[in-house]
């Protein structure tokens, strides 16, 4: 559905919301009719976030531990600066999201969910474990990596920047982040936690 959304200048989240009958957004069956009028246009056209410049291969992801200082507010602001995005709406949403995902710990690793499988990496944990302050899996981190950020998944600025690019692509969050809490429940302090 992402290609259809882009072709019709509609956010993916809006297209999915307008088509609850579609059970697998990666597979549209012949004869299946989509509702294109129920969606809302993605601000600025079909691309709702930065270009994919910066994506890296899975083999380029590194697994060092973060030893610097800072907090989620500062890291999110830096991610916004790197991506040339206004931080006003992103910071509050990511304070909530990161508190729920990792308690704000840039070295957090989830070894107990369904992603925790694959070959052991240099940090001693399976490849697909969620890692870092925004709990990115390496697949998501590498495909949404932002140029000019670290390739280390534990670097909080790089982790948050990749997560921001992911939510813009996956959920259609606008580049100014004004709709982050609406489209990503995990970033909304007024709704219960929900994975993203």
Task: For each feature predicted by the language model, list its residue ranges.
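Extracellular LysM carbohydrate-binding repeats and other cell-envelope/extracellular binding modules
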Residues: 3-46
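Peptidoglycan cell-wall recognition and remodeling modules
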Residues: 12, 16-26, 57-196
């Amino acid at each position: 559905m992402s290609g259809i959304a882009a072709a019709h200048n509609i956010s993916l989240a809006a297209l999915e919301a307008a088509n609850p009958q579609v059970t697998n957004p990666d597979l549209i069956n012949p004869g299946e009719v989509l509702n294109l009028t129920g969606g809302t246009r993605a601000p600025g056209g079909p691309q709702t976030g930065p270009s994919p410049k910066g994506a890296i291969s899975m083999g380029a992801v590194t697994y060092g531990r973060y030893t610097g200082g800072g907090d989620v507010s500062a890291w999110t602001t830096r991610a916004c600066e790197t991506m040339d995005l206004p931080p006003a709406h992103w910071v509050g949403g990511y304070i909530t999201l990161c508190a729920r995902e990792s308690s704000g710990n840039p070295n957090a690793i989830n070894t107990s969910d369904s992603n925790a499988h694959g070959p052991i990496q240099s940090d001693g944990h399976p490849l697909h474990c969620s890692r870092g302050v925004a709990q990115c899996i390496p697949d998501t981190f590498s495909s949404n990596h932002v140029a000019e950020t670290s390739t280390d998944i534990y670097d909080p600025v790089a982790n948050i920047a990749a997560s921001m690019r992911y939510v813009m692509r996956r959920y259609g969050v606008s580049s100014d982040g004004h709709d982050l809490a609406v489209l990503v429940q995990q970033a909304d302090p007024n709704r219960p936690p929900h994975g993203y």
